[in-house]
Amino acid sequence: MVKYKSRLKEIRQGTGLTIDQVVVATGISKRTIITIENEEGANPSVDTVKRLIKYFEISFEELYP
């Protein structure tokens, strides 16, 4: 099974946002955000990925290159 690493941390930090700001804006739990940012092969739900893509106005390929 191929494991993909998210660019979420890089994208979030590039916008100057804190994890807490992303949590409030997206409704995604802090634990989930931290897991996606720090664990290669994290397996977020489709809904979570869609929320992040919409919030940051990015494509799936930008989040998971």
Where are these regions (language model features)?
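Recognition helix of helix-turn-helix/homeodomain-like DNA-binding domains
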Residues: 28-43
